[in-house]
C-alpha cells in the first residue's frame, strides 16, 4: 500500500515508522526531517498549507490514502480537498475537526448533547462581558483562545497568571491580538486533579481507544515554567496510569464515544484520530480539550507499543470497518530534547549531534521533531523542540532509566526535563490524586 504522510515533526516520524512496517510512505513535509526522509519511499519539502502541491505530490506517487499529522492542515480543510480528488484520509474533515480548532464549538457540543465530563465555562466575543464573568465567577479561572495556538495559548490562574486580575489582562491581550484567529475567548473553571490523555482510532462509527498516557507540558523540572507543546510523556504496561483506575479509563472512553456521536449529528462522521485530554477530578474524569490528531509526544508512546498493522488500521478507518487493535503489555517513556532556554531560546541554527547507533544499542529510539538537515547533512536546531528519545520496557522505571542513558548521546546546546516519568514524580502524582479523592 502507498500512503501519503503530511507533516514534518516527531509525531509524523513515529506515524511513518509504524506505517512503514507494511506500507510505502510518501512524505510531504514543511522542512527536511532526517528521520522522515530516511523512512520515506519518496518525499518533498514544501509549504504544508499549499494544498495544490500536496495533491500533485499524492497523485504523482499514486498514493491510496493519506495520513494527516498536524492540526493546521486539518483546520484549513486538507481532508476535504483530498477527498475531492478521490484520496481518502486518516483525519477529520474541516467541519469535524472543529472539535479541536474551535474551543467554543467543543464546549457548546457538550452542552447541547449533555455529554458527561463537561465543566463550568463561558464563551465571549465582548471584552466587558468576559471581564464581568471573571468578576462574578469569584474562583480561579483558565483562559483559552478559541482557535489554535500550538498548545501554548492556555494560561491558568495560580500558574502563569497570578490572579483573576491578571487573567483579565490576558483576555484583553487575546482580543487585541486576535490570538488563535478569533476576537473571542473561552473562560473555564480551574480543575483540581491529574491530567492524562487517551487517544483513539475512529472510523466514523466505531472508536477503539489506545493506552492512556501522561504528558508533561511545563518547560522546566518540577512542573515549573511556561506551558509548551509537551516535554515528555509515559504510558504503563497495563494501559492505565499509576493514578488512573480501569473505571476512570472506561468513563473517559464513554465520554469520547458520546462525543463522536454528537459530532456526527452536528457536522458529519468523524474519521481519524481523536485525542482526549482529561483531568481526573474528585468526581471523575472531566474533559479539558480535544485534539483532532495524535498528540506530540503521546503518539510516540502508543505507536511504540502497538502490536498491529497501522497501515491496515488506516485503511479500516477510511473504509468504516474498524474492528480491533492490539497493543503490547509494555511501558514506554518519551523525553523531549529541546534547545537551551526553550521556549525562549536563542540557539537556533546550531548543530545538534545525535549518535543514533549508541542510542539504539541501549534499546531506545529517536524521533526527530523541529530540526532540519542542512546541505552538509548536519542536523540543526530550530527554536522549537528538537527530538524525542523513547524507550519501551517492562516497567516505567526501566524505560525511564534507558531514556536518561540514551540522551547522553545527544550533544549540543540542548536541555531536557530529567524528572519526566521518574519514580519520585510518579509518587507525587499518586499522592496528589489520593488527596484529591478525599
UniProtKB/Swiss-Prot annotation:
Cofactor(s) required, per the database record: Mg(2+); Mn(2+)
Keyword annotations: ATP-binding, Ligase, Magnesium, Manganese, Metal-binding, Nucleotide-binding, Purine biosynthesis
Positions of Mg(2+) 1 binding: 277, 289
Gene3D superfamilies: 3.40.50.20, ATP-grasp fold, A domain, ATP-grasp fold, B domain, Phosphoribosylglycinamide synthetase, C-terminal domain
Entries under HAMAP family matching the protein: GARS (MF_00138)
Family of the protein in this entry: Belongs to the GARS family.
Protein name in the entry: Phosphoribosylamine--glycine ligase
Amino acid at each position: 500500500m502507498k500512503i501519503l504522510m503530511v507533516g514534518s515533526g516527531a509525531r509524523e516520524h513515529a506515524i511513518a515508522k509504524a506505517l512503514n512496517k507494511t506500507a510505502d510512505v510518501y512524505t510531504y513535509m514543511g522542512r527536511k526531517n532526517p528521520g522522515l526522509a530516511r523512512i520515506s519511499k519518496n518525499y518533498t519539502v514544501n509549504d504544508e498549507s499549499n494544498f495544490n502541491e500536496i495533491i500533485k505530490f499524492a497523485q504523482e506517487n499514486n498514493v491510496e490514502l493519506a495520513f494527516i499529522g498536524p492540526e493546521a492542515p486539518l483546520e484549513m480543510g486538507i481532508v476535504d480537498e483530498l477527498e475531492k480528488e478521490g484520496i481518502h484520509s486518516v483525519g477529520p474533515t474541516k467541519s469535524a475537526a472543529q472539535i479541536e480548532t474551535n474551543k467554543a464549538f467543543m464546549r457548546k457540543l457538550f452542552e447541547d448533547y449533555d455529554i458527561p465530563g463537561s465543566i463550568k465555562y463561558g464563551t465571549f466575543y465582548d471584552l466587558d462581558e468576559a471581564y464581568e464573568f471573571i468578576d462574578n465567577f469569584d474562583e480561579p479561572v483558565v483562559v483559552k483562545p478559541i482557535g489554535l495556538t500550538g498548545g501554548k495559548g492556555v494560561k491558568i490562574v495560580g500558574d502563569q497568571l497570578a490572579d483573576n486580575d491578571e487573567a483579565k489582562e490576558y483576555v484583553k491581550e487575546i482580543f487585541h491580538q486576535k490570538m488563535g484567529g478569533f476576537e473571542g475567548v473561552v473562560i473555564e473553571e480551574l480543575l483540581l486533579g491529574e491530567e492524562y490523555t487517551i487517544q483513539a482510532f475512529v472510523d466514523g462509527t466505531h472508536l477503539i481507544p489506545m493506552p492512556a498516557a501522561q504528558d508533561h507540558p511545563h518547560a522546566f523540572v518540577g512542573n515549573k515554567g511556561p506551558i509548551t507543546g509537551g516535554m515528555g510523556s509515559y504510558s504503563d504496561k497495563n494501559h492505565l496510569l499509576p493514578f488512573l483506575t480501569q473505571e476512570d479509563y472506561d468513563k473517559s472512553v464513554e465520554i469520547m464515544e458520546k462525543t463522536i456521536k454528537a459530532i456526527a449529528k452536528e457536522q458529519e462522521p468523524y474519521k481519524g484520530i481523536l485525542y482526549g485530554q482529561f483531568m481526573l477530578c474528585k468526581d471523575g474524569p472531566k474533559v479539558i480539550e480535544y485534539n483532532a490528531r495524535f498528540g506530540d509526544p503521546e503518539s510516540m508512546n502508543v505507536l511504540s507499543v502497538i502490536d498491529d498493522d497501522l497501515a491496515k488500521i488506516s485503511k479500516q478507518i477510511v473504509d468504516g470497518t474498524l474492528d480491533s487493535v492490539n497493543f503490547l503489555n509494555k511501558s514506554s517513556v518519551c523525553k523531549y530534547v529541546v534547545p537551551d532556554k526553550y521556549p525562549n531560546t536563542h540557539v537556533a541554527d546550531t548543530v545538534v549531534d545525535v549518535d543514533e547507533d549508541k542510542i539504539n544499542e541501549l534499546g531506545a529510539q529517536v524521533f526527530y521533531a523541529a530540526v532540519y538537515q542542512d546541505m552538509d547533512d548536519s542536523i540543526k536546531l530550530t527554536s522549537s523542540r528538537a527530538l524525542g528519545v523513547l524507550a519501551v520496557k517492562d516497567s516505567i522505571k526501566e524505560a525511564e532509566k534507558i531514556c536518561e542513558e540514551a540522551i547522553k548521546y545527544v550533544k549540543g546546546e540542548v536541555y531536557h526535563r530529567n524528572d519526566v516519568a521518574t519514580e519520585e514524580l510518579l509518587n507525587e502524582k499518586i499522592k496528589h490524586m489520593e488527596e484529591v479523592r478525599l
